[in-house]
């Protein structure tokens, strides 16, 4: 008999992350015989642009997608409103579908997952995606000096323990995060209950052998990057990435190598150029490009090396940067800082780049670029061993099998 799963995501499927880190897994699990209903919260503009394409993907893969719309304002109250909005939909679906399992991505949707488990006895997967509550505080979103945010923080810390203890399975992005959870000594939280599944990458898409060398060379010429040492960055910068420190690192590179810092990001270019100017980096030595996700693999091959420095705070123990998976898959050396998830350990194990120490949350102990130990084939092998999307699907399948086909 076909098993039925309800997947809840507060992230939209029309967001790039929704497509790469949710839909791909659901499609893989659907092929193994799980029938999925997917509820996600979509941003109106993104839905207008991408909604039809996502509907088509879901139709082709027999996924019952039920998009709802994300409420942005007023903050806090808007999230409550979204939860109130989702519950009647789920109640109706539960009546008709009789779900066997509810898979909740992060904390907000886990409030619903826990309720469904208590009311209907449905198996509940807490796919925690990191220490979300602490991220909100460390990222300056929740100011604990405010009584309102202090109350919300305490509420979710209490719920966090309930999600961990009452769930049937937990997914952590990192081994460092898993070890931290085990140190909390909570009831019913064991090593066997926690699976580590990092942010994975589709190795068919991020495959340097599948990209024409002449096309990359033409792109390099078009962007005037020939005879330059290209230091790259990919992705948004946001709250967590240390742009000032990355610029400081770039400045240490020998001018004789004619370096240029190329950032592939949809963030406002002028803000980045202004930061570079403050750091006394000439405009001709920095280039900001907005690139479609489908064109990222080819653009990564422009890089001679890539850098990302992330704030090494408590919550980042559970961080798994997707960019690391993509860069290693493409055989690009990665320069990162220690204290962020499993990133440094993976770089060192697979000789995939260079790790720099973190002096504190906001400062990296920058040393000169040194890629003498870099091994391109080992880095690509590391991506296959650790970040392969197919392996990620199999790890989720192990969880589903254990919960849905338990021996009686």
Regions found by a protein language model. Name each.
Residues 264-265, 270-300:
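Nucleotide-activated donor-binding/catalytic signature segment of Leloir-type glycosyltransferases, i.e.
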Residues 1-55, 60-66, 171, 248-256, ...:
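N-terminal subdomain of nucleotide-sugar transferases
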Residues 50-57, 207-224, 378:
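A short helix/loop element that forms part of the nucleotide-sugar donor recognition site in Leloir-type
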Residues 373-389, 398:
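A short, well-ordered alpha-helix in the C-terminal region of glycosyltransferases
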Residues 16, 241, 290-299, 306-328, ...:
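Nucleotide-sugar-dependent
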Residues 6-8, 225-241, 247-250:
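Conserved donor-binding/catalytic core segment of Leloir-type glycosyltransferases
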Residues 87-92, 111, 115-119, 132-134, ...:
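Membrane-proximal helix-turn-helix segments that form the acceptor-binding/catalytic region
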Residues 176, 200:
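Carbohydrate-associated surface elements
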């Amino acid at each position: 008999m076909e098993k039925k799963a309800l997947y809840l995501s507060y992230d939209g499927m029309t967001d790039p992350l929704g497509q790469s880190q949710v839909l791909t897994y659901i499609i893989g699990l659907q092929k193994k015989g799980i029938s999925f209903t997917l509820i996600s919260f979509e941003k109106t503009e993104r839905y207008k642009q991408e909604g039809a394409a996502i509907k088509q993907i879901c139709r082709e893969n027999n996924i019952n997608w039920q998009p709802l719309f994300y409420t942005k304002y007023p903050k806090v109250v808007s999230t409550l409103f979204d939860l109130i909005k989702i519950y009647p939909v789920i109640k109706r679906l539960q009546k008709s579908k009789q779900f066997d399992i509810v898979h909740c991505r992060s904390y907000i949707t886990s409030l619903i997952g826990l309720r469904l488990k208590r009311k209907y006895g449905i198996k509940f997967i807490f796919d925690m995606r990191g220490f979300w509550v602490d991220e909100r505080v460390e990222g300056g979103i929740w100011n604990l000096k405010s009584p309102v945010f202090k109350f919300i923080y305490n509420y979710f810390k209490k719920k966090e323990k309930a999600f961990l203890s009452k769930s049937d399975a937990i997914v952590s992005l990192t081994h460092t995060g898993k070890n931290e959870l085990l140190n909390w000594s909570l009831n019913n939280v064991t090593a066997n209950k926690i699976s580590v599944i990092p942010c994975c990458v589709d190795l068919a898409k991020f495959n340097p052998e599948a990209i024409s060398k002449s096309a990359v060379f033409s792109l390099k010429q078009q962007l005037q990057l020939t005879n330059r040492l290209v230091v790259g960055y990919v992705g948004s910068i946001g709250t967590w990435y240390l742009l000032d420190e990355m610029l400081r690192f770039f400045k240490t590179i020998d001018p004789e190598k004619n370096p240029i810092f190329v950032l592939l990001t949809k963030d406002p270019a002028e803000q980045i150029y202004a930061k570079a100017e403050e750091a006394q980096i000439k405009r001709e030595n920095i280039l900001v490009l907005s690139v479609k996700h489908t064109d990222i693999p080819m653009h990564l091959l422009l890089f001679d090396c890539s850098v990302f420095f992330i704030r090494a705070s408590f919550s980042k123990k559970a961080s798994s940067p997707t960019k690391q998976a993509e860069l290693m898959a493409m055989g690009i050396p990665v320069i990162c800082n220690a204290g962020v998830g499993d990133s440094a350990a993976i770089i060192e194990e697979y000789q995939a780049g260079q790790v720099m120490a973190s002096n504190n949350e906001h400062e990296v102990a920058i040393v000169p670029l040194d890629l003498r130990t870099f091994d391109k084939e080992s880095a690509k092998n590391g991506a296959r061993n650790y970040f392969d999307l197919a392996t990620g699907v199999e790890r989720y399948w192990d969880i589903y099998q254990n919960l849905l086909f338990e021996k009686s």
